[in-house]
C-alpha cells in the first residue's frame, strides 16, 4: 500500500489474486495435458532441458529465499517478545535475534522439515491458520485504538505511486504457491482438475480478504511510515501486540517446512533422479537449512528480500511459465478464454520482472531495523493499555515494516 498508493494497492491485490488463481489452475491443466506430475517435468516436456534448468533454479531460489525471510521474521519478532519478560535484560544474548534463529531452527523447523510426506504438515497448517486469525484481530484492534493518534503522511491517500510495480512483486511473493502446487495436488485423495479448481478458488478468496484486511488496517494505522515487517511499527511495550508478535513468530516457523520440502524436491529431481535415500534425505535437508540459517543471520532488512524474491522468482513462476507452457501444449482455439488470458499474463509478467528488479535496486526501501518510532516515546504520546492488566503504556512511532504486505 505504501509503494502502490492505497486505492491502487487494493485493486492490485484483487488483480494479483485473480492471476494467481488462474495460473494455479492453468498449471495443473498443463500437467494433465503433458501427462506430468511435477512443475519441473512439465517444463522439461514443454521446453526441454534449458527450460527445465531455468525452472529448477527459480523453483529452488523462491522457497530458499522465503526460508531466509522467515528466519529474519522469527528472529526479529520473537526477540521483542522475550524482551518484554519482566527481569530479562534486553541486551541478553540468549534473547537476541541470532540466538533465536538458531534455537528455532534446531528445535522446530529442522525436525518438521525432516518429514517425507507433505500431508503430515496438515495439522501444522491448521494451527498457522488459527494464529493468523488472532493476529488479524490484533492488527484490527490497534488500527482502531492506535491509528487515530498517529499523524498521517502528506501523500497517504494519493491514488497511485511510482513504485506500484515493486508492490506487485511483493504481492506475488505473498500469494505464490506454484512451487509446491504439484506436491499439494498429489496429496489430495482424488486429484482431479475440477477438485483442484474448487480448492484453489476457495483458498484464494480467503487469502485475498485476509491480505486486504491486514494491508488496510496496517496502512490506515501507519500510512507512509510503513516498512517491510508490520510489527516493526508497533511499540515494544504494547502487551497486546507482543502477544501478536508471538503468534506471528510461531506462524512463520510452522510455515518454514513447506518451503524446505520444495527445495529438497528440486535437489532430488535435478541430482538424484527424484528419489532420496534416508541418509541423503537427512543430509540434503540439513545442508539446505544450514545455509538458509547462516544467510539469515547476516541479513536483517526484510523489505529488499521480499521485493527481489517477488520480482525475480515469484513473477516468472506465476505469470510467465504457466502461461508459456499452456500456450504451447493446448490445442484449444486462439479465442479460448484460457489462451487469451495466457497471452495477456505472459508479457505483463515480463514487464513486472524487468522493471520491478530495476526499481528494487534503484529505489531501495529504508530499513530501520530494531528502532522505536517517535510516537512510542513518552514525550510524544501515551496510550492506555487495553489488555487485562490495564497498565499505562506509552507508544512510539516505529517505521512500519509490513511482512504481511505493503
From Swiss-Prot:
Q: Which residues lie on this side of the membrane: Cytoplasmic?
A: 1-7
One Gene Ontology term of the biological-process aspect is: amino acid transmembrane transport
Q: Which GO terms describe its molecular function?
A: L-amino acid transmembrane transporter activity
What membrane topology does this protein have?
Answer: Multi-pass membrane protein
Q: Where in the cell is it found?
A: Membrane
GO-annotated cellular components: membrane
What residue intervals traverse the membrane? 8-28, 48-68, 93-113, 121-141, 156-176, 202-222, 241-263, 279-299, 301-321, 340-360
Swiss-Prot/TrEMBL keywords: Amino-acid transport, Glycoprotein, Ion transport, Membrane, Sodium, Sodium transport, Transmembrane, Transmembrane helix, Transport
**Where on the tree of life does the source sit, at the highest rank?**
Eukaryota
Record PANTHER family = AMINO ACID TRANSPORTER, SODIUM-COUPLED NEUTRAL AMINO ACID TRANSPORTER 11-RELATED
The entry sums up its family as follows:
Belongs to the amino acid/polyamine transporter 2 family.
| Function summary | Putative sodium-dependent amino acid/proton antiporter.
Name used for this protein in its record: Putative sodium-coupled neutral amino acid transporter 11
Q: Tell me what organism the protein belongs to.
A: Homo sapiens
| Gene transcribed to yield this protein | SLC38A11
